[in-house]
Amino acid sequence: MSLLLTIAKEYKRLCQDAKAAQMMTVGTVSNYTTFKKWTTSRKEKNPSLRMRWAMSSKFPIIANKRMLEEAQIPKEHNNVALWEDTEDVSKRDHVLASASCINYWNFCGPCVNNSEVIKEVYKSRFGRLERRKEIMWKELRFTLVDRQRRRVDTQPVEQRLRTGEIKDLQMWTLFEDEAPLASKFILDNYGLVKEMRSKFANKPLNKEVVAHMLEKQFNPESRFLPVFGAIRPERMELIHALGGETWIQEANTAGISNVDQRKNDMRAVCRKVCLAANASIMNAKSKLVEYIKSTSMRIGETERKLEELIPETDDVSPEVTLCKSALGGPLGKTLSFGPMLLKKISGSGVKVKDTVYIQGVRAVQFEYWSEQEEFYGEYKSATALFSRKERSLEWITIGGGINEDRKRLLAMCMIFCRDGDYFKDAPATITMADLTTKLGREIPYQYVMMNWIQKSEDNLEALLYSRGIVETNPGKMGSSMGIDGSKRAIKSLRAVTIQSGKIDMPESKEKIHLELSDNLEAFDSSGRIVATILDLPSDKKVTFQDVSFQHPDLAVLRDEKTAITKGYEALIKRLGTGDNDIPSLIAKKDYLSLYNLPEVKLMAPLIRPNRKGVYSRVARKLVSTQVTTGHYSLHELIKVLPFTYFAPKQGMFEGRFFFSNDSFVEPGVNNNVLSWSKADSSKIYCHGIAIRVPLVVGDEHMDTSLALLEGFSVCENDPRAPMVTGQDLIDVGFGQKVRLFVGQGSVRTFKRTASQRAASSDVNKNVKKIKMSN
């Protein structure tokens, strides 16, 4: 009784407040579900069952009353109650609604065409679908697959950003007022922030969706996956369909809808063949033509020659320009200078020579142009229009781009125009060693300066300071460029202005024909150099999945793992009976020819560069020692032969021979790179792929270890018998024993028994004796 009296008193006290009295007398506060939700903190034991029980009620959800009325959703449809005008006790201006209200909205509500918005939101997923449509599936093979768990990118992106950088970009794009202090990334890439803001402005997207889109646009979604073969993102996103532990599904994964990716692939292939041709000491031009004609790329479902694709592209990058000039194709009035692309707008310069002093002592000549000319320039995200005359950059207007790209574009334009004090006296850190390549070729001074600004940020800013610093006119604040590449600088660089948008490249219908010198310099009919091998950017490690390099010199450009397999396969094919095959060279102890086999040279670029001399010393010693003692295995010799090509060098050997992709072979030990079984000498396994060893001498159709040699019979192995070649058998006397390689890694001892007798006759006689005894 006392408990009920206490509750009644508390109820009377609460009813003194009008709002509390309304909540106590109106609404669903007596509903068990609502009452329990607001009066307990106990964790629900069976939330799924509770949800089903709650949804079975008449009005299990709440909805905004104003939105229901604006959407003209009735309270009842087809005798089914959709909502009622009863205000919910937990949220103001919301009323109770049924699950049928959602169905009515979906099927009878206002129609909205969100197809374009959906494509924009799920752009990465639609892109993946398009790439899958372009795949050309090939044969399915069952074999042991050597997979390694590696961190790989599973989504192609236009620009890769780190996780912290993506979060900064999201905050500065979506929450400008709440964003933290600008990080170095935001300061250097504020142009990207403005681009993203303008991209998503006035679009019917909430901020959570835009944040998702930004993450998908710049995040390559790195994962640790068991992979094999090439690791391009286009391939990694469907690695689960390309192979398992015991099967491989061959497929080409080039993206024909991605124009930028095709252009990058074209540049990468052209850069590789140009650098490979430049490594040739003589006839670099003819080598480049050979490489181009022997290379093909898959475009869509067809494979096309590189020499057909190069004339069709309008790319003016230096690597593509060099390949075009090698083929003699026409080119627009464009030229390259390092990684910067240029197009002349007007003017015609006259070439003049001048002198710069290295370390104040050595005079080095360089060339410049005396007449006024105007150019369009492009570097990454930044573009520019500029004018040069004599040895100066008269003016330049830079459009778009981030601060870092604007700085480097201005520096390259200054070097191109020979502007600044460094074309009178060279920087103190430039020495005479910087003026020549490793092959002893002279490097023009302007390219020496290009290499110099790439070494450090201090060198870049020192060159920009030589342009001259002036006080910024307050009326031009925002249009002048500071030393850091920004617009709002108190002090700016002389005659340098910035505009917000990019500058469009002017069209040029005039075509010119280029010539290519043996030094890989492309020049026009007037002798002006348009592109040179020195313009090529530093080589990058690129894996080619859809490019075929048929020339033997370019085998190393394939996937390194594939190149190693092909190299060992070529060496195993040398286990024949010819004069220049491996067994004959071993029998003659012609080590020099053995170490310089074309197959050995082919694998030389795959060796770890800083250890090649040490590996050569150890490998050569292993080969010579085993051959001299007569106790050797051809399988073991094949394993270490690729490491014998280079000149020997003293050094510490760790017991393993490493390739440049960190795979290795170890003498006397089988591993995934190279392995075999003594029980089956007919196969050698390289990266899980079985390579068949040549069969016996004289009979390619018999899978046996007997040599069918007239006048000889097989006898018990005698290690004291001399090792001879097949051509030397004619000199073997009656009753003498010799050892001869017979195939599949086997060496047998033979004895001269007669002039017209062979091992096959011994086999036939034994078969007859067995039949007679039975």
Curated annotation (Swiss-Prot):
**Domain of life according to the entry:** Viruses
Q: Which InterPro entries match?
A: Flu_PB2_2nd, Flu_PB2_6th, Flu_PB2_C, Flu_PB2_CAP-bd, Flu_PB2_middle, Flu_PB2_N, INV_PB2, PB2_helical
User: Localized where?
Assistant: Virion; Host nucleus
Extract one GO BP annotation from the record: symbiont-mediated suppression of host gene expression
Sorted alphabetically, which Pfam families does this protein's record hold? Flu_PB2_1st, Flu_PB2_2nd, Flu_PB2_3rd, Flu_PB2_4th, Flu_PB2_5th, Flu_PB2_6th, Flu_PB2_7th
Q: Can you name a GO cellular component term? A: host cell nucleus
One molecular function GO term is: RNA binding
The entry's keywords? Cap snatching, Eukaryotic host gene expression shutoff by virus, Eukaryotic host transcription shutoff by virus, Host gene expression shutoff by virus, Host nucleus, Host-virus interaction, Inhibition of host RNA polymerase II by virus, mRNA capping, mRNA processing, Viral transcription, Virion
Q: State the family it belongs to.
A: Belongs to the influenza viruses PB2 family.
Subunit text: Influenza RNA polymerase is composed of three subunits: PB1, PB2 and PA. Interacts (via N-terminus) with PB1 (via C-terminus). Interacts with nucleoprotein NP (via N-terminus).
Biological role stated in the UniProt entry: Plays an essential role in transcription initiation and cap-stealing mechanism, in which cellular capped pre-mRNAs are used to generate primers for viral transcription. Recognizes and binds a wide range of cap structures of target pre-RNAs which are subsequently cleaved after 10-13 nucleotides by the viral protein PA. Plays a role in the initiation of the viral genome replication and modulates the activity of the ribonucleoprotein (RNP) complex.
Q: What is this protein called?
A: Polymerase basic protein 2
Say which species the protein is native to.
Influenza C virus (strain C/Berlin/1/1985)
Q: What is the lineage of its organism?
A: Viruses, Riboviria, Orthornavirae, Negarnaviricota, Polyploviricotina
